[in-house]
């Protein structure tokens, strides 16, 4: 005889929360990528930053940039900048455009280049003759889409004393306006060249707040559009041995998140 069975398959979508991230729902995609074996070493004078575009993750050490598969962590080789010199910080916007900055001392020309992908030649997005009296270019951040509406920020820093200021460019319809200097008031202190200060806009709306972190204040500050600190959201647990830096803001499942990286600034303790 013949035995016959009929099966029916139905697809069920797991329940999804309406807002934010559910703790424990994350999955580690890859880990243990040995940068040392790739010749990417931690050393003085390096300026580390990350950007993501398409299926690629870009790691910059300043003058040198390296490509990885963002889904697997596989090393893809060096990033060809096609002759464009951008030895400063790097980031990517909400649309996957990559932004590259150069380092600029006082009175030098500060430039930010943009490319839609790692295959495209970076083109100049904005330039500014550095009249701040300090240096700039180590950290840049962006919210929005630089081909449409966005905000680009760049902290300034000095090796002589401390500063508590950053520059802001409002981009409308892909066109950057003249930069505005924002002086932060209400923070614990300023930062110098070792402070690794970073500031990130909440959105592409210039009236929205910013998030700021740096050594050695070691706190996450909420700063309004005028530069006044309104909240001190998080503080370090290691005191002067902490280093708050690398702020980022993103939207996930209808919720806004601000993230910071906390490391040890010193080798003791």
Please annotate each region the language model reported:
Residues 2-17:
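Extracellular fibronectin type III
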Residues 56-60, 97-100, 151-157, 208-213, ...:
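Conserved beta-propeller blade signature
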Residues 18-37, 75-83, 119-132, 176-188, ...:
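Beta-propeller fold detector
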């Amino acid at each position: 005889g013949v035995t016959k069975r009929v099966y029916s398959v139905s697809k069920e979508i797991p329940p999804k929360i309406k807002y934010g991230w559910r703790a424990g729902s994350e999955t580690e995609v890859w880990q243990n990528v040995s940068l040392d074996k790739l010749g990417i070493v931690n050393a003085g004078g390096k300026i580390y930053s990350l950007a993501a575009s398409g299926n690629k993750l870009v790691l910059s050490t300043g003058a040198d940039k390296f490509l990885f598969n963002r889904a697997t962590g596989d090393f893809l080789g060096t990033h060809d900048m096609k002759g464009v010199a951008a030895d400063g910080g790097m980031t990517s916007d909400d649309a996957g455009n990559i932004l590259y900055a150069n380092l600029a001392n006082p009175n030098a020309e500060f430039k930010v280049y943009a490319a839609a992908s790692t295959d495209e030649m970076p083109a100049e997005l904005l330039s500014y003759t550095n009249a701040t009296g300090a240096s700039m270019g180590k950290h840049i951040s962006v919210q929005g889409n630089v081909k449409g509406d966005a905000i680009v920020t760049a902290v300034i820093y000095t090796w002589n004393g401390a500063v508590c200021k950053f520059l802001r460019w409002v981009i409308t319809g892909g066109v950057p306006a003249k930069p505005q200097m924002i002086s932060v008031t209400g923070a614990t202190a300023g930062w110098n060249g070792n402070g690794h200060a970073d500031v990130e806009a909440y959105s592409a709306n210039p009236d929205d707040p910013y998030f700021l972190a740096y050594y050695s204040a070691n706190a996450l500050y909420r700063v309004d559009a005028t530069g006044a600190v309104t909240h001190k959201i998080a503080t370090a647990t290691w005191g002067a041995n902490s280093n708050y830096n690398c702020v980022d803001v993103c939207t996930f499942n209808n919720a806004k998140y601000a993230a910071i990286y906390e490391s040890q600034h010193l080798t003791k303790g």
